[in-house]
Amino acid sequence: MQVWSATGRRKRAVAQVRICSPGTGTIKVNQVDAEQYLQGAYANILKPFEKLQLDATYDIFIRTEGGGLTGQSDAIRLGCARALCMMNSEYRTPLKSAGFLTRIALKKERKKYGLKKARKAPQFSKR
């Protein structure tokens, strides 16, 4: 049994992905079925596998923490793409062109004192 591991991050979410081969196509997130855990964001994590036209011969075990469901699903997608690149270096080109290996570094900006939010100032009155 071969195992490839990679980490993906997005906003506050961190996902540690392990892809095991050979497998039965099981995908677990925090020991829960991925479809049940991610609900509407489930299709997002399968995109790297669909791009490479890989069938369900792998088991994928994922540990996530932080962030919301969308951030976690994007972190999982990045982790899966990185693990697939470790598995076979020829996968790198199609995954890179599809944008699955790009780390989105946007994070929430902190609130500053004297302001209502990160950039929103209280209403200005001249008189």
UniProtKB/Swiss-Prot annotation:
UniProt keyword list: Chloroplast, Plastid, Ribonucleoprotein, Ribosomal protein
UniProt-listed SUPFAM superfamilies: Ribosomal protein S5 domain 2-like
Keyword Ribosomal protein appears in the UniProt entry: yes
One of the GO biological process terms: translation
First-listed, main subcellular location of the protein, grouped into a coarse class: plastid
Cystine residue pairs: none
PROSITE patterns given in the database record: RIBOSOMAL_S9 (PS00360)
Pfam families in the cross-refs: Ribosomal_S9
Zinc found in the keyword field: no
Recorded GO CC terms: chloroplast; small ribosomal subunit
Subcellular location: Plastid, Chloroplast
Molecular-function annotations in GO: RNA binding; structural constituent of ribosome
Similarity comment: Belongs to the universal ribosomal protein uS9 family.
HAMAP family according to UniProt: Ribosomal_uS9_B
PANTHER family: RIBOSOMAL PROTEIN S9, SMALL RIBOSOMAL SUBUNIT PROTEIN US9M
Protein name from the UniProt record: Small ribosomal subunit protein uS9c
Annotated source species: Ostreococcus tauri
